[in-house]
Amino acid sequence: MAQETNHSQVPMLCSTGCGFYGNPRTNGMCSVCYKEHLQRQNSSNGRISPPATSVSSLSESLPVQCTDGSVPEAQSTLDSTSSSMQPSPVSNQSLLSESVASSQLDSTSVDKAVPETEDLQASVSDTAQQPSEEQSKSLEKPKQKKNRCFMCRKKVGLTGFECRCGNVYCGVHRYSDVHNCSYNYKADAAEKIRKENPVVVGEKIQKI
């Protein structure tokens, strides 16, 4: 009879339609679909949520551990800040040396500034004197240009001839032999010849 019942049972497919063979023990579903079905039931009933006792125990233990570990860290940070706030002797010495050097530089700059101010005052006084001299020169009457012949007192204007003796003559009295010129032309010519033709002298023969 048992053999007949085994032969009569035909394998059935999964009731969810996934394509696998189902099992009557799992409500006609395959093993995968049955596990998913159980997970859905557990999630709907809230059985997956963790127990409150474990969460509360963890929440109580964690703050205690954090506070215990944070105390030495806070103390170490306070110690480090206090040590950093205390002035070191090396920094004090460096500050003193810098202040002394800055005071010396200030004194030298003041000493240098005094001669500079004196020089500026002297230059200002010189510049003040120069305009006064220029004004005095400008006040002097300009020399009148000679526009008349020295011999006949005729107005010559721009057509006058200025001689080397320093006088102006007309076209008639411009020659030196006419107005008895006092300029020494011979001496001037001799001087020019001396300058243009220097004397060339050979080296002296050294006697043995």
From Swiss-Prot:
Q: Which Pfam families match?
A: zf-A20 (PF01754), zf-AN1 (PF01428)
Show the ranges annotated as biased composition (Polar residues). 41-68, 95-110, 120-133
> Where does the record place the region Disordered?
41-140
- Which cysteine residues pair off into disulfide bonds? none
Gene3D superfamilies, A to Z: 1.20.5.4770, AN1-like Zinc finger
Task: Give its localization.
Answer: Cytoplasm
Residue positions annotated to bind Zn(2+) 2 are C149, C152, C170, H173
Signal peptide start-end: none
Coiled-coil annotated spans: none
Residues that bear Phosphoserine: S49
Q: What does this protein do?
A: Involved in regulation of TNF-alpha induced NF-kappa-B activation and apoptosis. Involved in modulation of 'Lys-48'-linked polyubiquitination status of TRAF2 and decreases association of TRAF2 with RIPK1. Required for PTS1 target sequence-dependent protein import into peroxisomes and PEX5 stability; may cooperate with PEX6. In vitro involved in PEX5 export from the cytosol to peroxisomes.
Identification of the protein by name: AN1-type zinc finger protein 6
Organism of provenance: Pongo abelii (Sumatran orangutan)
